Amino acid sequence: MIGRLRGTLAEKQPPHLIIDVNGVGYELEVPMTTLYRLPKVGEPVTVHTHLVVREDAHLLYGFAEKRERELFRELIRLNGVGPKLALALMSGLEVDELVRCVQAQDASVLVRVPGVGKKTAERLLVELKDRFKAWETSPAMFTLVSDGPLPVASESSAEADAVSALVSLGYKPQEASKAIAAIKDKAGLSSEELIRRSLKGMIAK
């Protein structure tokens, strides 16, 4: 089991990245909340990881904090929740926000995540309620990410990368494009910032 990687961030193509560890490039998929915290390409980075072994592939998932990894592991233990849906949930909501939704048994936020209907949301809340009783949360509510701007990038490529990342989470191309188009003053924003604002608009309403 690979539990942590420390190396140089070699590539960043949301939601995937490659970390160079002593000349070996490890490809990972990460939730958007982790992506926002990553350094620039070429800088040192450390991520906590979870390895999923399938017959046709070994898939590595990365997280900025151990707590995020533990949440991911709790989610994929649930019936009908695979890595893709777990990442979609974690990309739209910070750990504290998702835990509070479960503790309050509030399905209204969960149903805004692609792939989560009303029945699925209600089932997830019931199955996670006991597991999250001991989880502590900070007092702030719906602080999806900081409002500070992220690094500037080429507008056309940043928007294309953002749409691609949203589609990978389960949104339809039209929904993703519409969410990006609805962002005000988006000229020069990075793909990470575009993703952050679009998810905030679609989920944390």
Swiss-Prot record:
User: What does the record list as coiled-coil region(s)?
Assistant: none
One GO BP: DNA recombination
Q: Quote the subcellular location field of this record.
A: Cytoplasm
An example of a Gene Ontology cellular component annotation for this protein is: Holliday junction helicase complex
Q: Where is this region: Domain III?
A: 154-205
> What are the GO MF terms of this UniProt record?
ATP binding; four-way junction DNA binding; four-way junction helicase activity
Note down the stretches annotated as region Domain I.
1-64
Annotated stretches, region: Domain II = 65-143
CDD domains hit by this protein: UBA_RuvA_C (cd14332)
Q: Which UniProt keywords apply?
A: Cytoplasm, DNA damage, DNA recombination, DNA repair, DNA-binding
Q: Report residue spans for region: Flexible linker.
A: 144-154
InterPro entries tied to this protein: DNA_helicase_Holl-junc_RuvA_I, Hlx-hairpin-Hlx_DNA-bd_motif, NA-bd_OB-fold, RuvA, RuvA_2-like, RuvA_C, RuvA_C_sf
> Pfam families this protein is in?
HHH_5 (PF14520), RuvA_C (PF07499), RuvA_N (PF01330)
Q: What does this protein do, in the record's words?
A: The RuvA-RuvB-RuvC complex processes Holliday junction (HJ) DNA during genetic recombination and DNA repair, while the RuvA-RuvB complex plays an important role in the rescue of blocked DNA replication forks via replication fork reversal (RFR). RuvA specifically binds to HJ cruciform DNA, conferring on it an open structure. The RuvB hexamer acts as an ATP-dependent pump, pulling dsDNA into and through the RuvAB complex. HJ branch migration allows RuvC to scan DNA until it finds its consensus sequence, where it cleaves and resolves the cruciform DNA.
Q: What is known of its domains?
A: Has three domains with a flexible linker between the domains II and III and assumes an 'L' shape. Domain III is highly mobile and contacts RuvB.
In the record, the note on similarity to other proteins reads: Belongs to the RuvA family.
Q: How does it assemble?
A: Homotetramer. Forms an RuvA(8)-RuvB(12)-Holliday junction (HJ) complex. HJ DNA is sandwiched between 2 RuvA tetramers; dsDNA enters through RuvA and exits via RuvB. An RuvB hexamer assembles on each DNA strand where it exits the tetramer. Each RuvB hexamer is contacted by two RuvA subunits (via domain III) on 2 adjacent RuvB subunits; this complex drives branch migration. In the full resolvosome a probable DNA-RuvA(4)-RuvB(12)-RuvC(2) complex forms which resolves the HJ.
Q: What is this protein called?
A: Holliday junction branch migration complex subunit RuvA
